[in-house]
Amino acid sequence: MSARAGIVVTGTEVLTGRVQDQNGPWLADRLLELGVELGHITLCGDRPADIEAQLRFLAGQGVDLIITSGGLGPTADDMTVEIVSRFCGRELVLDAAVEARIGEIVKGMMARFPGVDADAVLAANRKQALVPAGAVVLDPVGTAPGVVVAGSPTVVVLPGPPRELQPMWHAAVATDAVQTAIAGRTRYQQQTIRMFGLPESGLADTLRDAEKTVADFDRLEITTCLRRGELEIVTRFEPRDTATYAALEGLLRDRHAREIFSTDGALVDDQIAELLAGRSIATAESCTAGMLAARLTERAGSSAYVAGGVVAYSNAAKTELLGVDAGLIERHGAVSEPVAEAMAAGALQRFGADTAVAITGIAGPGGGTPTKPVGTVCFSVALAGGASVTRATRLPGNRSDIRERSTTVAMHLLRRALTGGG
């Protein structure tokens, strides 16, 4: 049986949703890469009894490794190290070398704040130099060191900020204690297929058939997820089952070739960035109010191909900023394929681009009519030279869902236009 792990994400701000947890999913991926089975991710607040209860729960599940995140700061509610020390039966001791290192970091930070009492800050941060006796101390990235406490289970204590946790994790994995804890791991392979335009029921039908026709199908660990209107199929398997996975992938390709857009885990955003190399794109948005432009510019280096965008929310803005004929809007309505086409053409001209995408729709909750209900969205992708792809669809969900799904639809229409998929 493979080595197993559990993760405890601490922090009342995470528990209550004020801060979104990034550490649990990131650590889950890293464990998967190591071939370690993840049994549980738990969230709890800053109360010591709650944190200790999570540690005892995971230990009772027989995990070999527990990883905690958060609660390593200098304030009174940062008590994770103390709780782990008690859980592991270790005395809490002051590490002079760690104290000196933290002192150097704090003095460097305080040099930028001459009016602050550095000695008072140092006294508060002294708490961070208290570590369980015999623990391996991980050098701080911020001011908080991490610790690794060997045992059954071994416990890795990491800071909460992802920018500190992520580099420290690699140091933790290299320790003898963690290597011993995960010695029984099984090396897995993981493959991801992404689809767009296929309902979950259609994929479910194919997987039911695969269960009957693909030899050793039960040796594949398959998870599916619908996100942003896309289907993600993640399959994990041992190297000896590569042929079984190949048979599954072949069946998916046979049934859903048009809907599959990625078999190597690449996101549509990655593909669009590659397809736009050497091109210039402009956006014209109404109901999404700049969300598509924001998504296109999330990738570093996007300034090489994103010329600009216009948020033309009102009819007047569509006319004044994009040159859409007011009579066209009067005849067809602002949410219509002709207006979407005119918006895309206007963006091409305004920015001197060779590619443009336009979105106009009714995100709700009001504004719908019997002929154009809430969720009606029209898209147009225009390429220099006259080629264009225009679509109208009705998207489900609330206002936020419709706006987010609209950006996804637009990205896929753009992908198909740039690859000649129509």
UniProtKB/Swiss-Prot annotation:
It comes from the Bacteria. Belongs to the CinA family. This is CinA-like protein. The lineage of its organism: Bacteria, Bacillati, Actinomycetota, Actinomycetes, Mycobacteriales.
